[in-house]
Amino acid sequence: MTPADLAELLRGTAAKVLDERGLDVSVLPETLTVERPRNPEHGDYATNVAMQVAKKVGTNPRELAGWLAEALTAAEGIDSADIAGPGFLNIRLAADAQGAIVAKILDEGAAFGSGHTLDGKRINLEFVSANPTGPIHLGGTRWAAVGDALGRILSTQGAAVTREYYFNDHGAQIDRFSRSLIAAAKGEPAPEDGYAGAYIADIAAQVQSQRPDVLELPAGEQQEVFRAIGVDLMFAHIKRTLHEFGVDFDVYFHENSLFESGAVEKAVETLKDSGNLFQEDGAWWLKSTDFGDDKDRVVIKSDGNAAYIAGDIAYFQDKRSRGFDLCIYMLGADHHGYIGRLKAAAAAFGDDPDTVEVLIGQMVNLVRDGVAVKMSKRAGTVITLDDLVEAIGVDASRYAMIRSSVDSSIDIDLELWTSTGNENPVYYVQYAHARLSAIARNAADLGIAVADPDFSLLVSEQEGDLIRTLGEYPRVVTSAANLREPHRIARYLEELAGAYHRFYGACRILPQGDEEVGPLHIARLALCDASRQVLSNGLALLGVSAPEQM
């Protein structure tokens, strides 16, 4: 019996108890929750439903808890239900009901943890979207890992997710990039507002290799060649780096296409016609304060050129025209102002602002021997995704980026993430999976088949703790999807690995010496198989490997 199964049983029991006493059943919450008590001696699960409902039906919480306890104790799969404090209920499952979680995991396999909370929802998930003017830095690396994991998690709940990269190939930064390439090709210092680093010289050399005559062209043509070829080369590098990091996109959307197709102009005219743009000092402004933004935003500047938000507005319209119900934007720490303006733009078009979600990620720092690492060998001024992977590997890089809430800044300690001890979170989790895989191999070598396990034999404290932890997995995945918080999966996996390691230390799994294989061995092997499955499922959601050996 999973926590969700127990919550469903609890609600049905509560409804019956209230109905039998002529009390109002409608006061019950649509969904009840059960929690694992901090002290396992208090039971397997606890609920405060009696305290939530008692006053609404005119009774005492402890009295209502007593009625519920009596009814629950008679239910199949419940060993006991005891009243605590002012009206809490502590519930203990029967051993076979608790073990049914293991059977469910083994039956569902890789699908265990999937749900239906987002069935039918079409979600556009835009992340990374780094400018094609340099390698991906640590902030973009964080979004690559978190965004990819979030896409996987949302998909498990039934959503149709499109991963999208917004290719910023329109604007002044591309001009600065091309001028930097020209300077490098000529052996001159980078422009004051340009880009530096060995990668600039590399790309400039590749442009010259493709167009040996480029420096002989007129200045305007010269810049256009460096711009076109240089951007293509840089973006190819970005795509390749992301692919090697385990991140691929369904759509690469070019910002420039919005201007070339007239989509920006059309969006602006639509807003003018709706009365949501006004003219002042020669510029056109979006009445974004009418829709909750902290100030009105310039859409068309007084010189007639489009402001950056004009492209954002047209881009949102394009996404909605493709049928997405929800557009999630994952942006850096310096983009807080985008939340209000994007929601205001949606509202100005008559859309529900809640069709826009903006997730803001905080800074990432790299630390070695307690000192921040600030310089990249290739990029010159910033640490890149390539630098991080070279230092600690793909798995550790992804896990380190995902395991903390995006609301918090993180320091990645190179020594910690390359260590092979329990203090390294990804090693701790992966080692649990490898140890479980070794047990499965050893069992196979001994000719032991896991058939018809008797889960009622799994009665030790460590077995119960491991089973209850396994049962939490679907709820954790659902929560991670609904809250857009992939770090919940990582933290859960660490908890599960801990529960498994404690079980491994306390319970002998395989027969030793001449000992015959008994029902308890079979039950424990089944528990091990279920644990390995859930660890594998969770690591897959994070895009981290589940090694068979370490």
UniProtKB/Swiss-Prot annotation:
It is found in: Cytoplasm. It comes from the Bacteria. It is an enzyme of class 6 (ligase). It catalyses: tRNA(Arg) + L-arginine + ATP = L-arginyl-tRNA(Arg) + AMP + diphosphate. GO terms for molecular function: arginine-tRNA ligase activity; ATP binding. It holds the Pfam family Arg_tRNA_synt_N. The keyword Manganese does not apply. Its EC number is 6.1.1.19. GO terms for cellular component: cytoplasm. Belongs to the class-I aminoacyl-tRNA synthetase family. This is Arginine--tRNA ligase. It comes from Rhodococcus jostii (strain RHA1). The lineage of its organism: Bacteria, Bacillati, Actinomycetota, Actinomycetes, Mycobacteriales.
